[in-house]
Amino acid sequence: IQEVKKLAAKKGFVIYDEPYKLNIWGFRANSNIPNSFDDEIHIFTNIAKTGRPVWSYLVFKCTTDPGTYWLRNPMNPQGTAILNPGQYINSHGLGLHRGKYKALVQIGRVSVTRDYDRDAILDFNNGKVVTGLYGINIHRASKVGDTIRVDKYSAGCQVFKNGGDFDFFMKLCEVHRKAHGNKFTYTLVDERMESRKSLKNLAIGAALVALVFGGFFLIAPDNNTNEDE
């Protein structure tokens, strides 16, 4: 929880500490391999009714990316939607996914990148960014057990790999709804972007160290010469 708090502070994201109010964070893996459940959804909440927060923290496997079927066959002519990283306040509520089963459905605006080239490769840095209501729901893949490949299960939705994990998540959402109403905030972090920023900062830091030490060695001979004289 401390690492997430640091990340939230750095990005200006909200962490809710009201009892039983869910923090729902997706972490997109440092990978561009399509059709795999290689991402994570982190659910954490304060379970202490009074006093200092006592955090319950759960991690579930998921995908935050569309499957290859929809990358090749987008429902929208501009391309398949890939959710952009960010924090989307009150973006979701309990409802029915495609009218079939209970899930968190999109009720507020989110930003997506339209992957338009239909090559089944996840293009996170190319394409058109748009903001609006696109049915970016949080739901499950197969009802029972693990699902191995994303395929048609995601056209941009955030999808749980395991049906049982999702059922448990729905129970947590019901507790949240009863205590705080039917609005949920979803936060998506792209670990590749964070890794690139870390590497960039590391490179800048290394360059500064090199300049400092390089400057010292450039100055040192002159100082030594003056002392000898």
Specify the residue positions occupied by each region the protein language model found.
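Helix-capping/helix-break motifs at membrane-protein junctions
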Residues: 161-162
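Cell wall/extracellular polymer interaction/catalysis modules
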Residues: 1-151, 165-174, 180-184, 191-193
